Amino acid sequence: MDVMEALVTRRSIRRYWNKTLPAGVLEELLEVARYYPSGLNLQPLKFMSVAETEDVTFVTENLRWAGYLPGYEIGVDERPVSYILIFGDRQISNQFDFAAGSAVNQLLLAVHGKGLGACCLAIHKKTQILEHFRLNAQRFEPLYAIAIGYAKHGATTVDLTSNCKYTLDENGDFIVPKRTVSELTIIK
């Protein structure tokens, strides 16, 4: 798949098959992650791969899934098999927005390129994540969790007509409205 195809076909995946990733995939993704663009080349992010069942369960239960779908819960048999957690390192910088956005996109595309599914979820329960992994709260700020696994559902895009909320079709696949190019373009 070429880069343009990857950019257009990558969708967020929120349900996964319980199938182990091939050996070395998380390490390869971490290697790719380190090339994220960073202002002043500060590289203020740290990454943690999470693959132990207990840790994956903990992270899954401390994230908010599919916020537009009231009552949506990810089934025990549909959880991702791994995560890459992204942290800001305050010993390097207190500004993470640009770097985190770049790193997230880099990882999502790399996962897609491996034929896997992924979803980026903001970490809101920062204290719980820090305590569970015994990390220094003064130094590290939990930012995002990239859920990774084999996709158990599909996702298609449609032109946005009324609102941007995604929905599920009769097969449980996500329908994701996207703004048209003309709606996104500023003409002077």
Question: Where does each model-flagged region fall?
Answer:
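Acidic, surface-exposed loops and disordered segments
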Residues: 1-188
